[in-house]
Amino acid sequence: MSGKGKAGKSGGKAGSETKSMSRSSKAGLQFPVGRVHRLLKKGNYAQRVGAGAPVYMAAVLEYLAAEILELAGNAARDNKKQRIVPRHLQLAIRNDEELHKLLGNVVISQGGVVPHIAPELLPSKSSKGKKDEGVSQEL
């Protein structure tokens, strides 16, 4: 054995104390990489799960959650509310084209419906300010 090799599994001295670091903190994520890895293995999606797959999946889940929460927070603020409720999630998802496409078949309990009035039912803007000086409607 040469003297230039690593001493032990950690690569440092045998007696040194190193603080363990989670895979989530190594990747700079808030979502749990270890839990995602465990669920990927337990779900029988594939025979083997690579080391990078749970990190990538946790990052994608964290991004989607942040995107939905930001839009829902904006919807809550527009309604002058401090707390995000399912209605705000529904409005956020249905008003965003890409999220609506992704979650099109998802039903959000207590979400309600997105308000929409057909353009044909709205009052026409052309008749505003003009008076009919043509033939009278009286018989």
UniProtKB/Swiss-Prot annotation:
Domain of life of the organism in this record?
Answer: Eukaryota
Which cysteine pairs are covalently linked by disulfides here?
Answer: none
Task: Identify the keywords attached in UniProt to this record, alphabetized.
Answer: Acetylation, Chromosome, DNA damage, DNA repair, DNA-binding, Methylation, Nucleosome core, Nucleus, Phosphoprotein
Q: Where, by residue number, is the motif [ST]-Q motif?
A: 136-137
Give the organism, scientific name. Agaricus bisporus
Which sequence positions carry the modification called Phosphoserine? S136
> Which sequence positions carry the modification called N5-methylglutamine?
Q110
Lineage of producing organism: Eukaryota, Fungi, Dikarya, Basidiomycota, Agaricomycotina
What's the protein here called? Histone H2A
Q: Name one GO cellular component term.
A: nucleus
Q: What is known of its domains?
A: The [ST]-Q motif constitutes a recognition sequence for kinases from the PI3/PI4-kinase family.
Listed GO molecular functions? DNA binding; protein heterodimerization activity; structural constituent of chromatin
Q: Where in the cell is it found?
A: Nucleus; Chromosome
Q: Which portions of the sequence form the region Disordered? A: 1-27, 119-139
In terms of SMART domains, this protein maps to: H2A
Residue spans of biased composition, Basic and acidic residues class: 129-139
Other comment: In contrast to vertebrates and insects, its C-terminus is not monoubiquitinated.
Residue numbers carrying N6-acetyllysine = K9, K13
Its chief place of residence is nucleus
- Entry PTM: Phosphorylated to form H2AS128ph (gamma-H2A) in response to DNA double-strand breaks (DSBs) generated by exogenous genotoxic agents and by stalled replication forks. Phosphorylation is dependent on the DNA damage checkpoint kinases MEC1/ATR and TEL1/ATM, spreads on either side of a detected DSB site and may mark the surrounding chromatin for recruitment of proteins required for DNA damage signaling and repair. Gamma-H2A is removed from the DNA prior to the strand invasion-primer extension step of the repair process and subsequently dephosphorylated.
Q: List this protein's GO terms for biological process.
A: DNA repair
Task: Provide the function of this protein.
Answer: Core component of nucleosome which plays a central role in DNA double strand break (DSB) repair. Nucleosomes wrap and compact DNA into chromatin, limiting DNA accessibility to the cellular machineries which require DNA as a template. Histones thereby play a central role in transcription regulation, DNA repair, DNA replication and chromosomal stability. DNA accessibility is regulated via a complex set of post-translational modifications of histones, also called histone code, and nucleosome remodeling.
Q: Provide the family line.
A: Belongs to the histone H2A family.
Could you tell me which InterPro entries the record lists for this protein?
Histone-fold, Histone_H2A, Histone_H2A/H2B/H3, Histone_H2A_C, Histone_H2A_CS
